[in-house]
Amino acid sequence: MTDVWLLFLLLLTLLAGFSCKTIEKHPYLTTQTPITLLSSNDGEINQVFLKTVEQTTDWNLTTKDSFTVIHLGPNHPPLIKTIYDTAPAFIMGTPSMGMSKDGRFGIIANHGWRPTEFKKLRLPPGPRTNADITPGMLNHEKFTAQHANVISLIDLSIENFPVVHRMLLEDFPIHVLSHPDGERFIVGASDYFYLFKIVDSKLVEINRSKHPHGMPEFWVTPNGNNLIATQAASRIPLLPGEAGEMMLPQIHWYAIEGDNIKHLSEVKISSHLNTEVLPETAILRVSNDGKMALICQRSNNSGKDFSDILIADLTLEEPEITSFIEDAADGIESFAFHPNGKMAVATGLGTYHNCIVVLDIASKPVRVLYTMDAKGISQGIEFTPDGEKLFVGSAITGRIEVFDVVGDYELRKNPKFLNVGFGHNSLTIGPRYNN
């Protein structure tokens, strides 16, 4: 009997030791290596959810656009700073941005296209569109032109995180991503795909490639040779502050050949699948091995039904949507792929009852493992490079939630979170710059 008790006590000791390993060594959030999170924050989307004392929508725009820089590391509390009124950042677009490979620069894209509901907002006086902006205004510290088609370059190595260069575009830049070569940045806009590089703290255009397919939500394959984009064109010319008349989106496959981006084919749904592209089909992301793309069938919420996740097979000569996950959530906004190649996470778009969806992408077919509670209207989502933590931003709570990763597939919500500016709309992650 004594031996049994000794074994029992030994087992308890081992379990206690294992549990202790899951507890943070410090009383604050840490990461194994120094990293930087960049969150862009759209005052307009936050304003849509603010109420007057009469509980009607307050259409007077008082929430400022901002971006938040968060430095995390192994031996210090999170260093968080939010900068207001220097880089416009509208929410409509893929919820990610560009960051230089050394973590020194961040790039935010803003455009003037506005869905009908946002036209109700009463903006403060001042410049609004490209036509209102003089060359000198581009060099001012403050820049609040909500409907400008502009790209902002932020120096993350300087304490007050100044915007060191702004570039106006004639068309509507929806999204910016770093190219895997670590040197170039791709901007997807309504008429062109642009390639930029950074020279002496300025954006320099390398080339632009014309396309006829409309505003792109895109992602680049890990080898840098292709990109896939969901695109919607307008039946009438797009104007700043206007909604246009958007056609049904299509999904397209492009080759990146040197500094040119060339259309290859439309990515269609396999005829045997009982799913479809919807007017709100939009955001997508490519897996870390480049073999699949997850596509949001409906990038908005309804409060009454659920939408699918479309899955494109990128290994085919002409990629095709060959499977889907039915009724994943009330709208899907974004995806993150864990470095282990087994787990992916999708964000839902519920306002008051929201979730993230954990997927097993190693199974055939891809399957949902479970859902977890998350704050309303999820946007940006990123794993740390080592895969130990997951960050999920919310558009209406002014925070980024943190989930700890346990094993291959388990997430545990950390009670600690990171404050960001209200209206969070995009998130990107990179190394902390070290000069």
Where are the language model's segments positioned?
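Predominantly soluble domains enriched in secretory-pathway, periplasmic, or organellar proteins
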Residues: 22-435
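Positively charged n-region of N-terminal signal peptides that target proteins for export
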Residues: 1-7
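Bacterial N-terminal signal peptides
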Residues: 7-17
